Amino acid sequence: MGVDLQVTVNLDHPELLDAPVLETGVLSAEGRALPTPPRPRIVGVGTAVTRTSYSQQEVLDAFGITDRKVRSIFLNSAIERRNLTLPPMDSDSVRVSESQGDLLDKHKKLAIEMGAEALHACLKRCGAELSDLRHLCCVTSTGFLTPGLSALLIRELGIDRHCSRSDIVGMGCNAGLNALNVVAGWSAAHPGELAVVLCAEACSAAYTMDSTMRTAVVNSLFGDGAAAVALLAGPGGATPATSEGPTVLKFASCIIPEAVDAMRYDWDRTQGRFSFFLDPQIPYVVGAHAETVVDRLLSGTGLRRSDIGHWLVHSGGKKVIDAVVVNLGLTRHDVRHTIGVLRDQGNVSSGSFLFSYERLLEEGITRPGEYGVLMTMGPGSTIETALVQW
């Protein structure tokens, strides 16, 4: 009876002799080297937002909100502007009330429009065409669609009918990394074939209006946005555009069952529609567990938190970001992209971390061998992480 022996080598950057080693090869019982499954690389990213942008003051004015406490929540959110699709005004210049059916229609329309734009931008960045796409995974939590968004986009854009697809629905703000994990596995099993994760969140289609502080917090936070990220494992026609992306090395998750009700998007019988609930303790719950999941992510890699050059964290809100910074010992500079996305877009849910990733790429400062951590958090309560290397 033979035993497989694992040998560790750095295949991506063999020139970095002092770099921690993360790639694993396997020897068979006969001592022959078995091929190592190719690791997926991020080869493109693209984002999109809806056409209209509002300051927090403009949103307050649009709905005639005068309550001092509610106004304070909006104006002290560290958010300057958000892209939103507000309801039309009636003959008296008052915003009309939207039914749940209206909101579902809005979600479908905006998700397709933003999703298509983000997908095109992503493919353009990596020098690919729609005809190159072999797997499309769509993520959304701001509406429910059957058939899923992937099927609707395939029809809308004329994508090959043989393109495989998947939809991740209802997982919330963490779902972009859940999807990246799944699609990274697909990419490794299909070397040379292009896959895309597309997050499309029409947060303007997931709101309610009342006088509670709970609703005020939610309505002050979210914005419309879509983000797409392309993955490719092994050979596949790499170009200068695709070489800027990192290799995906590892994922780690942490769900906090005792806080399962702390973040919810469920049916509000009083309002007759779906609505968000965000517990005020969320920042502290996330902060208290951030260190645990990051340490698990780095376990066995030889890396310490101080070795991570780039942190791309979900723009979950001012207090959530502060809690992550404090508990991981980061600086405001470390999360500058996250802070900037929150300031300019608000919380765009599952695709927020990809907006931050796009900003990092635009800086042009990443260097071969550097490591990055991607982090999202959402209902469950859940923290998702990924380790990448340029």
From Swiss-Prot:
The keyword Transferase applies. The keyword Cell membrane does not apply. One of its GO terms (biological process) is vancomycin biosynthetic process. GO terms for molecular function: acyltransferase activity, transferring groups other than amino-acyl groups. Disulfide bonds: none annotated. The active site is at 173. It catalyses: 4 malonyl-CoA + 4 H(+) = (3,5-dihydroxyphenyl)acetyl-CoA + 4 CO2 + 3 CoA + H2O. Pfam families: Chal_sti_synt_C, Chal_sti_synt_N. It comes from the Bacteria. Transmembrane segments: none annotated. Keywords: Antibiotic biosynthesis, Transferase. SUPFAM superfamilies: Thiolase-like. Its EC number is 2.3.1.246. It is an enzyme of class 2 (transferase). Pathway: Antibiotic biosynthesis; vancomycin biosynthesis. Involved in the biosynthesis of the nonproteinogenic amino acid monomer (S)-3,5-dihydroxyphenylglycine (Dpg) responsible of the production of vancomycin and teicoplanin antibiotics. Catalyzes the Claisen condensation of four molecules of malonyl-CoA to yield 3,5-dihydroxyphenylacetyl-CoA (DPA-CoA) and three free coenzyme A (CoA). DpgA requires the presence of the dehydratases DpgB and DpgD to facilitate the aromatization of the DPA-S-DgpA or DPA-S-CoA intermediate. Belongs to the thiolase-like superfamily. Chalcone/stilbene synthases family. This is 3,5-dihydroxyphenylacetyl-CoA synthase.
